């Protein structure tokens, strides 16, 4: 019952924030963590959004994006990683949902799939997905970019996992 109340409050707060973002167009800064294990990526579902994302959230005042990424990873899925295990792979500015958002995505490769835990309030699900299945989901746009970047590079593929263009396509003829 308490968890359901929290989920309702998160949804109401999110809707209110979307109105605020549309009117005020604030600058925001977020940090996310792309965890890969066995060729699969960890995605989360928040109780208040219709899409899948990576563990992460806002960068607090006087906090670096890397510190925020590590903090959010612990808060959202109960995992602690050292800073040395995370590399920034995406740094993008976008206007999705009406805000002027700066998103930094850090990536780590884990040799063994960790056990993750979710609170059932803010984060309601977390699971590892193969890239093709992940890309078929409704994703937060910077998350899609990170998956396409990693999957394409690992498989010698171009955008969205499509085969990279051959020499004739690259040269325009």
Annotate each predicted stretch with a short phrase.
Residues 38-40, 109-114, 131-133:
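Short loop segments at secondary-structure junctions
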């Amino acid at each position: 019952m308490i968890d359901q109340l929290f989920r309702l409050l998160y949804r109401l707060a999110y809707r209110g924030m979307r109105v605020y973002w549309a009117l005020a167009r604030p600058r925001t800064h977020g940090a996310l963590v792309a965890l890969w294990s066995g060729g699969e990526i960890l995605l989360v579902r928040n109780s208040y959004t219709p899409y899948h994302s990576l563990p992460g959230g806002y960068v607090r005042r006087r906090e670096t994006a890397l510190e925020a990424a590590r903090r959010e990873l612990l808060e959202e899925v109960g995992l602690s990683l050292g800073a040395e295990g995370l590399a920034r792979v995406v740094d993008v500015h976008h206007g999705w949902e009406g805000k002027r958002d700066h998103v930094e995505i850090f990536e780590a490769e884990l040799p063994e799939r960790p056990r993750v835990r979710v609170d059932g309030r803010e984060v309601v699900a977390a699971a590892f997905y193969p890239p093709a299945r992940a890309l078929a989901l409704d994703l937060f746009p910077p998350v899609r970019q990170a998956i396409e970047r990693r999957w394409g590079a690992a498989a010698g593929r171009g955008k969205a996992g499509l085969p990279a263009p051959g020499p004739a396509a690259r040269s325009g003829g």
